[in-house]
Curated annotation (Swiss-Prot):
Gene Ontology molecular functions: fructose 1,6-bisphosphate 1-phosphatase activity; metal ion binding; sedoheptulose-bisphosphatase activity
Binding locations of Mn(2+) 1: 33, 57
Record's protein name: D-fructose 1,6-bisphosphatase class 2/sedoheptulose 1,7-bisphosphatase
Pfam families reported for this sequence: FBPase_glpX
Function: Catalyzes the hydrolysis of fructose 1,6-bisphosphate (Fru 1,6-P2) and sedoheptulose 1,7-bisphosphate (Sed 1,7-P2) to fructose 6-phosphate and sedoheptulose 7-phosphate, respectively.
């Protein structure tokens, strides 16, 4: 699966990023998301596979395309059955966020990207649109930090594992009222805080790359993005833990349902028997082979955003494989029209 689909999923996120980037700075976050969804789905349907969306734009009645349960790929099309022999058929589960950080795109801010993760069937946790408490840290701190420990304890552990003072650590936290106490604790411990308005996938995986000046992600964000982050962190060897948050009283507002009971039922309907379980990266992305791909829409810590020029654009993407244990940055020049995409070496 790695060799067959790796390059194609790069093109999937590239097309989504280019489509969304055309709406950068126009204040139209919904449009920026919609065009990314359409572009991602169109390119995905050209891949020789039978794919199933396990994390997408919402449940079937909430989204017109890339909804949870939707099948994508050539081998799901009625007129392509002859092309898809059973013994050669690749069946995969897919988690997507065609425009992570819609507000960032709408207002021309840094950090938005098109992302997806894939694995063989059953290899990704099907997480509904609830929240997730998250902890991401560098590989050297893997299995030493713990989401059930305080921020102060975890910062001390990270500083010891990295052989640096707590004051030299930078922790990314989403700028939300629910994180007021967490932010205060991190600062009192001596570490520095980088607040972000949206898009915590990039922050999570940046912990696994030296030189990003990001050493931890803490706090509560969306669960679907947590699974996508876990897919990347599993392949990179970084630390990631997530615990589903299904009680609206904890977050006050956002993605989840009207009551705790409603959300518990939704979790059970999706096969999650223990809603309080703490998952690690290997449990959130448990497949034998896991691939992660992202393409910058606006500039970020890891990738440049889409840069347009007359009749073309330049993108920077990242593809991570658990099988080959590699993270590849791909710099691509796209010549619009009939000219094929050129990849810079």
């Amino acid at each position: 699966m790695d060799n067959v689909i790796g390059l194609e999923i790069i093109e999937v996120v590239e097309q989504a990023a280019i489509a969304s980037a055309r709406w950068m700075g126009k204040g139209e976050k919904n449009t920026a998301d919609e065009v990314a969804v359409e572009a991602m789905r169109e390119r995905m349907n050209k891949i020789h596979m039978r794919g199933r969306i396990v994390i997408g734009e919402g449940e079937r009645d909430e989204a017109p395309m890339l909804y949870i349960g939707e099948e994508v790929g050539i081998c799901t099309q009625p007129d392509a059955k002859k092309m898809c022999e059973v013994e050669q058929l690749i069946e995969i589960d897919i988690a997507v966020d065609p425009c992570e950080g819609t507000n960032l795109v709408a207002y021309g801010q840094n950090g938005s990207m098109a992302v997806l993760a894939i694995s063989e069937k059953g290899g990704l946790l099907a997480a509904p649109d609830v929240y997730m408490k998250k902890l991401a840290a560098p590989a050297v701190a893997k299995n030493h930090v713990d989401i059930n420990k305080s921020a102060t304890e975890n910062l001390k552990i990270i500083s010891e594992c990295m052989d640096r003072a707590v004051e030299e650590l930078v922790v990314v936290v989403m700028d939300r009222p629910r994180h007021k106490q967490l932010i205060s604790e991190i600062r009192q411990a001596g570490a520095r805080v980088r607040l972000i308005s949206d898009g915590d996938v990039s922050a999570a995986i940046s912990c696994a790359f030296a030189g990003t000046n990001i050493h931890a992600l803490m706090g509560i964000g969306a669960a679907p993005e947590g699974v996508i982050s876990a897919a990347a962190m599993r392949a990179l060897g970084g630390h990631f833990q997530g615990q589903l948050i299904y009680d609206p009283a904890i977050v006050k507002t956002g993605l989840i349902g009207e009551s705790k009971e409603d959300n518990m039922k939704r979790l059970k309907d999706m096969g999650i028997e223990d809603p309080d379980k703490v998952y690690n990266a290997e449990e959130l992305a448990s497949g034998e082979t896991v691939l992660f791909a992202a393409c910058g829409i606006t500039p970020g810590t890891l990738m440049e955003g889409v840069r347009f020029f007359p009749n073309g654009a330049r993108t920077q993407s990242l593809v991570i494989s658990s099988q080959s244990k590699t993270a590849r940055f791909v710099d691509t020049v796209h010549m619009f029209g009939e000219t094929k995409t050129l990849q810079l070496k």
